Each structure stands twice: as C-alpha cells, then as structure tokens.
Amino acid sequence: MPDFKELKNKIKHGDFQFVYDELKKSDFEYTLENIEKEFSSVDNRDMFCYLLYVVSNENTPKYTILLCDYLMHSGTFFYNRETVIRYLLDNCLVKSGNDITLIEWILSMYEYNPDSPYNEKEIANFNRIYDSLK
C-alpha cells in the first residue's frame, strides 16, 4: 500500500511522475470514489493537474471519463468547464474511435443538459452512433 501522505505532498509539489509510478506499482484502482477517499485533502487544481498527467500517459476512455467526472463532481474551480470536458472527450474519441463507454457518458451527462458543450445535432449523432454500437 502506498504512503498516501507522501503522495499527497508529491502532488502538491508537482512530482506527478513519482505519484504515477507509485500508484501503478500498487495497482491503484483509479475511480472517482478512490480519488476522493485517498486524496480528499489535495487541492482541486493540483488533483486536476495530476489526473490530466495520467491522461497524458494513458489516454484511454477510462481515464478520460475519470477526469471528466472529477471536473463535473469535485468542486469546479473555473468557469466553462464544459469546454475543457468537450476537448478531453473529443480528443479521446479521435484516439479511441467511437468508444461506446465515451458515448454513453456523453449522452448520460449532456443529452438533456442545457449546459451541454454539444449542440442538438451532435447529440442526435451520438445517439445514432450509440444505437449502431449496442
């Protein structure tokens, strides 16, 4: 089990590679619940930067969704977060193709959300893609 006190301090000081390596060695399960449990005292900006670092190393739907969930549910610290979320999702969609988990997440968060970064036409297109994948 990693020393989370040390890892929190390393995140605070921007030593993301150390934290990434330690968590990888310990098979840490990156979930929003685990992040909030183990790193609750870490500043939101620092945690966002660390999770962005994780995505830069492993740009997968799992980590992209985790980062987007973090932005949605863990105390937003900037305006227009949806612009950043859309960038992350679009980038991962390009890399991963039409990954069903990404499309499900987009639809679950934004299909009926007036703050959606996606317009109605784009949401309709995601619905068509989703229907073709299931």
Which residue ranges define each predicted feature?
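Terminal domain-start segments
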Residues: 1-47
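Short coil/turn connectors between adjacent alpha-helices in alpha-solenoid helical repeat scaffolds
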Residues: 33-41, 72-84, 111-123
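Intrinsically disordered, low-complexity segments enriched in charged and polar residues
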Residues: 1, 107, 111-114, 134
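Alpha-helical repeat scaffolds
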Residues: 6, 17-23, 45-56, 81-94, ...
